[in-house]
């Protein structure tokens, strides 16, 4: 009797331990649902597939799969045949048709309304309605799975410090072959910190950015109280100060706005802006100053056009115009540069007016994680003829005043950024940030890279060498993880083989683009009821939005209208750059990377 009782207890224990959905049996976005303790059922509804595991394509799906080119093939076509694309770009019907396909095919890969969060790996009202969570592209790995990645890989994940040191840490600066510059790097950091605002007091799965999109709270403040402290309440403008004839943000002392500065920073250098962390580096404060000037400039334009408007209407309409400018710059300059396409991307909300499209957005935790592009950062920051290491650069707004915005723009336009994919290019100064990114990913129980590749319609990697494109890091990965299906998302994105002469690998682009375009085009100003001249104060305001570019933003707000773009002016610089090619560890004694982590999100 005792033996039978023990066997029964063992059977019950085993049945409870083995969640049948841990193996991710349901393919092609089928939903796995447990049926008792040891059975599962795949819900294949509207996937285009059927069968026990949603693995058999329906007739129309089979045809689509036969005709559909691979993402790498599409990328090759879009980045070659420049003469053909010049013709396509000059024919509005063709350009509009292709752009519409780009927008719909990408944005339809994002669930809207949102589905999961870190605490709900099944659909629930809480996961839908609670805006304080980041949503999830894939549900978290269940707590009762035998390994951290479900059923694949080792029982314990490798030490995150080992992962960083062996695979991610820079040995020597690797410049980006696409010619990405520091104007791009700081734009990316400034732009994304309006919606990547992790609430670390509650945990990495929570956000303080409740707008979940492009609302410019990094300019105006997340709360009404912060906004009011930053506003002048005259002619719609934001508070400012004039130093040597140039407009800069006001100080913390003058606004009583909470900012993060070390105690030793002089009061006159503690500038106050919408995002509390933007005092961290002068590159962020550069963009904060440019957008402050742009807001007040737009207010002047609207005031002349509408002398009858009060302060509130001037402020609110200027904010909508700046949102429009931001989205246009991001699509037509920022994403255009990242893509490397000869096809010219276009910001035109009307392309989606006859499509099924939801004008809402929820930021996904995975989008936040994949955007940790710390390899962009150089070893030192070159401004005019001076170089600054990290210790000299951090929390040092005096550099901005000393050099001025014109020199900043000219210098950052010339300075090349690092390559993100390919591994071993995270600067030593931010290695603790990279480690924290891995640790937080584990807290959120992300599935493996291959599961995310399947989620975004990519073929899973079959070997470590296929992932990295070389042997040394592939061997390190295998020693750390044991199974290609158990490699973590964040490290994999950074060690992935880059596309030819590109900044990213396939996974980063094919995952990031849907999140990005859905977030941009899902903004309310892109909806039919908003996208009209009256929303922006008439044709004058509408024109500001429709003619915006990174160059016009700089020309309108920086003395001398210095040339700028998101890539270094001379493509040959990517071959010959030596500014940052020194061995990174040679100046480690000058760097205090922990200052980046203390009391704030690792997103920086």
Curated annotation (Swiss-Prot):
<feature type="modified residue" description="S-nitrosocysteine">
    <location>
        <position position="526"/>
    </location>
</feature>
<comment type="subunit">
    <text>Homodimer.</text>
</comment>
<dbReference type="GO" id="GO:0016702">
    <property type="term" value="F:oxidoreductase activity, acting on single donors with incorporation of molecular oxygen, incorporation of two atoms of oxygen"/>
</dbReference>
<keyword id="KW-0276">Fatty acid metabolism</keyword>
<dbReference type="GO" id="GO:0004666">
    <property type="term" value="F:prostaglandin-endoperoxide synthase activity"/>
</dbReference>
<keyword id="KW-0223">Dioxygenase</keyword>
<dbReference type="GO" id="GO:0005637">
    <property type="term" value="C:nuclear inner membrane"/>
</dbReference>
<keyword id="KW-0492">Microsome</keyword>
<dbReference type="InterPro" id="IPR010255">
    <property type="entry name" value="Haem_peroxidase_sf"/>
</dbReference>
<feature type="signal peptide">
    <location>
        <begin position="1"/>
        <end position="17"/>
    </location>
</feature>
<dbReference type="GO" id="GO:0005829">
    <property type="term" value="C:cytosol"/>
</dbReference>
<dbReference type="GO" id="GO:0031394">
    <property type="term" value="P:positive regulation of prostaglandin biosynthetic process"/>
</dbReference>
<feature type="disulfide bond">
    <location>
        <begin position="26"/>
        <end position="42"/>
    </location>
</feature>
<feature type="binding site" description="axial binding residue">
    <location>
        <position position="374"/>
    </location>
    <ligand>
        <name>heme b</name>
    </ligand>
</feature>
<dbReference type="GO" id="GO:0071471">
    <property type="term" value="P:cellular response to non-ionic osmotic stress"/>
</dbReference>
<comment type="pathway">
    <text>Lipid metabolism; prostaglandin biosynthesis.</text>
</comment>
<keyword id="KW-0349">Heme</keyword>
<keyword id="KW-0007">Acetylation</keyword>
<dbReference type="GO" id="GO:0019899">
    <property type="term" value="F:enzyme binding"/>
</dbReference>
<keyword id="KW-0443">Lipid metabolism</keyword>
<feature type="disulfide bond">
    <location>
        <begin position="555"/>
        <end position="561"/>
    </location>
</feature>
<dbReference type="GO" id="GO:0010269">
    <property type="term" value="P:response to selenium ion"/>
</dbReference>
<dbReference type="GO" id="GO:1902219">
    <property type="term" value="P:negative regulation of intrinsic apoptotic signaling pathway in response to osmotic stress"/>
</dbReference>
<dbReference type="GO" id="GO:0001516">
    <property type="term" value="P:prostaglandin biosynthetic process"/>
</dbReference>
<dbReference type="GO" id="GO:0050873">
    <property type="term" value="P:brown fat cell differentiation"/>
</dbReference>
<dbReference type="GO" id="GO:0008217">
    <property type="term" value="P:regulation of blood pressure"/>
</dbReference>
<keyword id="KW-0643">Prostaglandin biosynthesis</keyword>
<keyword id="KW-0408">Iron</keyword>
<keyword id="KW-0325">Glycoprotein</keyword>
<keyword id="KW-0275">Fatty acid biosynthesis</keyword>
<dbReference type="GO" id="GO:0005640">
    <property type="term" value="C:nuclear outer membrane"/>
</dbReference>
<keyword id="KW-0479">Metal-binding</keyword>
<keyword id="KW-0472">Membrane</keyword>
<dbReference type="GO" id="GO:0071456">
    <property type="term" value="P:cellular response to hypoxia"/>
</dbReference>
<dbReference type="GO" id="GO:0006979">
    <property type="term" value="P:response to oxidative stress"/>
</dbReference>
<dbReference type="Pfam" id="PF03098">
    <property type="entry name" value="An_peroxidase"/>
</dbReference>
<comment type="similarity">
    <text>Belongs to the prostaglandin G/H synthase family.</text>
</comment>
<dbReference type="GO" id="GO:0009624">
    <property type="term" value="P:response to nematode"/>
</dbReference>
<dbReference type="InterPro" id="IPR019791">
    <property type="entry name" value="Haem_peroxidase_animal"/>
</dbReference>
<dbReference type="GO" id="GO:0031622">
    <property type="term" value="P:positive regulation of fever generation"/>
</dbReference>
<dbReference type="GO" id="GO:0071498">
    <property type="term" value="P:cellular response to fluid shear stress"/>
</dbReference>
<keyword id="KW-0444">Lipid biosynthesis</keyword>
């Amino acid at each position: 009797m005792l033996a039978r009782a023990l066997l029964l207890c063992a059977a019950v224990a085993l049945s409870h331990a083995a969640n049948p959905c841990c193996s991710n049996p349901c393919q092609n976005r089928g939903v796995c649902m447990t049926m008792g303790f040891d059975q599962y059922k795949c819900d294949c509804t509207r996937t285009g597939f059927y069968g026990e595991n949603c693995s058999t394509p329906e007739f129309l799906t089979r045809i689509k799969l036969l005709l559909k080119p691979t993402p790498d093939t599409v990328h090759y076509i879009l980045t070659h045949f420049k003469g053909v694309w010049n013709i396509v770009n000059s024919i509005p019907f063709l350009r509009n048709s292709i752009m519409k396909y780009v927008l719909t095919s990408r944005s339809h890969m994002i669930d809207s309304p949102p589905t999961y969060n870190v605490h709900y790996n099944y659909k629930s009202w809480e996961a839908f309605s609670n805006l304080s969570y980041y949503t999830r592209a894939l549900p978290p790995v269940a707590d009762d799975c035998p390994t951290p990645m479900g059923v694949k890989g080792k029982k314990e994940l490798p030490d995150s410090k080992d992962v960083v040191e062996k695979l991610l840490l820079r040995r020597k600066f690797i410049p980006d072959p696409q010619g990405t510059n520091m104007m791009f790097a700081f734009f990316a950091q400034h732009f994304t910190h309006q919606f990547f605002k992790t609430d670390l007091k509650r945990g990495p799965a929570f956000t303080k950015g409740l707008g979940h999109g492009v609302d410019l709270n990094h300019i105006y403040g997340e709360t009404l109280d912060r906004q009011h402290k930053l506003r002048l309440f005259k002619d719609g403008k934001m508070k400012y100060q004039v130093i040597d004839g140039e407009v800069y943000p006001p100080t913390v002392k003058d606004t009583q706005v909470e900012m993060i500065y070390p105690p030793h920073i002089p009061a006159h250098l503690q500038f106050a802006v919408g995002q509390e962390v933007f005092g961290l580096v002068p590159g962020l404060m550069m963009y904060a100053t440019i957008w402050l000037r742009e807001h007040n400039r737009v207010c002047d334009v609207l005031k002349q056009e509408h002398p009858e408007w009060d302060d509130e209407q001037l402020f609110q309409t200027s904010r909508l115009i700046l949102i429009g400018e931001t989205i246009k710059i991001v699509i037509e300059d920022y994403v255009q540069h990242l893509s490397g396409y000869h096809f010219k991307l276009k910001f035109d909300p009307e392309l989606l007016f006859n499509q099924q499209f939801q004008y809402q957005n929820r930021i996904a935790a995975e989008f936040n994680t994949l955007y940790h592009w710390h390899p962009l950062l150089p070893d030192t920051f070159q401004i005019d003829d001076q170089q600054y290491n990290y210790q000299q650069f951090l929390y040092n707004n005096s550099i901005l005043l000393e050099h001025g915005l014109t020199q900043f723009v000219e210098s950052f336009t010339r300075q090349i950024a690092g390559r993100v994919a390919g591994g071993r290019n995270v600067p030593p100064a931010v290695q603790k940030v990279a480690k924290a990114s891995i640790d937080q990913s584990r807290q959120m129980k992300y599935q493996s890279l291959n599961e995310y590749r399947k989620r975004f319609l990519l073929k899973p990697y079959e070997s470590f060498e296929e992932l990295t494109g070389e042997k040394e890091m592939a061997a390190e990965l295998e020693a750390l993880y044991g199974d290609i299906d158990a490699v973590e998302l964040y490290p994999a994105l950074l060690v992935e083989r880059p596309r030819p002469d590109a900044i990213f690998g396939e996974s980063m682009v094919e995952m990031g683009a849907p999140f990005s375009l859905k977030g941009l085009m899902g903004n309310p100003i892109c909806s039919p009821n908003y996208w009209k001249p009256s929303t922006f104060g008439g044709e004058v305001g509408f024109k500001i939005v429709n003619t915006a570019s990174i160059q016009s933003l700089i020309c309108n707000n920086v003395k001398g209208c210095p040339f700028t773009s998101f890539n270094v002016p001379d493509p040959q610089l990517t071959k010959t750059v030596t500014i940052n090619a020194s061995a990174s560890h040679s100046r480690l004694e000058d760097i205090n990377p922990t200052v980046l982590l203390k009391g704030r999100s690792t997103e920086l």
